[in-house]
Amino acid sequence: MKGMFRTGLILFAAAAAACAPRERTLVLLSTNDMHAKIQNFPRLAAAVENCRDTAQLVVLVDAGDRWTGNAYVDMAATPGMPMIALMNRLGYDVATLGNHEFDHGQAFLGRMIDSMAFEVVCANVTSDTCTFPQLPPYVVLDKDGIRIGFVGVVTNYEGPGHPAGNASSFEGLEFPDPQAMAMKYAAELRPKIDLLVLVSHMGDDRDVELLGKETRFDVVIGGHTHVTVS
């Protein structure tokens, strides 16, 4: 009986260890407003690969405005494609839209999204046109058992009612309030995931304003206003 009791303790201890949560390190790396600065990509790629060599789990995210700003990229046979090719090769996971994604029209952007090997999410753009795909508002990634939700939003403040840019680029599209849509999907996702990330192209002032109203986001990855956050 004494030997059986010891065996029972060992089995119980093993079962308890198997059920205990594992401690893992997750690193979120982000870019925003790269504006086709292709000359900086080697340094970016080196930093990302170095992090992947040292961290257990790495997720790479972009918060919009990937092209418009460099003649080589903007005058390529397919404007913007050199940046997308490099982003695909580096292995981005998730991105949202910036206002400059619309610079060459909806049909062009739709084709570019098809060429992106990463998830593109935006919760506050709806389309009734056949030239622009209806994007998912969010995506959930599972990284070694950690469920991470990414909600994307883009500014609609400069239009007003749509992002900054030529109004003809936005015909047939609607851009509901990005903060309201972020809050809607935060409420929907929060019970289902471990980590909730907002990928925002609203600007730092609007991001801070949102965080005063919405506490369910664990991380905000922002862009649009080109502000360095320390």
Segments and roles (model prediction):
Residues 1-8:
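Bacterial N-terminal signal peptides that target proteins for export
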Residues 10-20:
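Hydrophobic h-region of N-terminal signal peptides that target proteins for export
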Residues 19-230:
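Acidic, metal/ion-coordinating pockets
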